[in-house]
Design a protein with these regions (language model features):
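SF2 helicase/translocase NTPase motor core
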Residues: 1-11, 17, 26-150, 156-160
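Residues at the beta-strand->loop junction immediately N-terminal to the Walker
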Residues: 21, 47, 168
């Protein structure tokens, strides 16, 4: 890693919750993987746009030598068992689960309780969200509104995690309020 990436990793290791807001192409993914590898805060969940899931899987293998599984319908009910599996050398078979924003409800929300106002308390999460020690949220500016279900799902999943890393090249899209929900997600 470059010197500025080493500084980013050191900062994330110290703070445990941060927004990596570098411009595109400066290695936010490598910094996040470096932070997870150095901290050992596995299992980790990566939440990213659907088009980036394969990239995250490749990058974890390339930069960290870590197997990552992409959550889909075929492993929907068994992924937690895959995290417990060991290879012949005794190391975990996989330490990272990757999913996209649009699948959070399908995989991690048990029920939405009807209330007059939709809040974080309206969501009943699947207990498997507690298996993760850390969460990486790629393109975190997608969570700029505190009113959307997607932002609330991310916030609820991130609660209580040892590490919460938010990656975005544009932390503020329209106005400074865009940053507020991203900060709420960090806790």
């Amino acid at each position: 890693p470059y010197e500025y990436q080493k500084e980013g990793i050191a900062y994330a290791l110290e703070k445990k919750r941060c927004i990596m807001g570098d411009e595109m192409g400066l290695g936010k993914t490598a910094q996040a993987i470096g932070t997870m590898t150095a901290s050992g805060a596995f299992p980790a969940l990566v939440i990213c746009p659907a088009s980036l899931k394969l990239n995250w899987q490749r990058e974890f293998r390339k930069f960290g030598g870590i197997n990552a599984i992409i959550l889909d319908d075929s492993n929907r009910n068994v992924w937690q068992n895959i995290l417990r599996m060991k290879r012949a050398d005794g190391k975990p078979f996989a330490q990272v689960v990757i999913t996209n924003y649009e699948s959070l409800k399908k995989f991690f929300v048990r029920r939405l309780n009807r209330q007059e106002r939709f809040t974080l308390k309206s969501i009943e999460f699947d207990e498997r969200v507690h298996l993760f020690r850390s969460v990486i949220i790629d393109e975190s500016h997608k969570c700029k509104s505190n009113k959307t279900q997607q932002s609330k799902f991310v916030q609820g999943i991130a609660q209580g995690k040892e590490y919460v890393l938010e990656l975005t090249g544009t932390p503020v899209v329209n106005n400074n309020m865009d940053l507020l929900q991203q900060l709420n997600i960090m806790g």
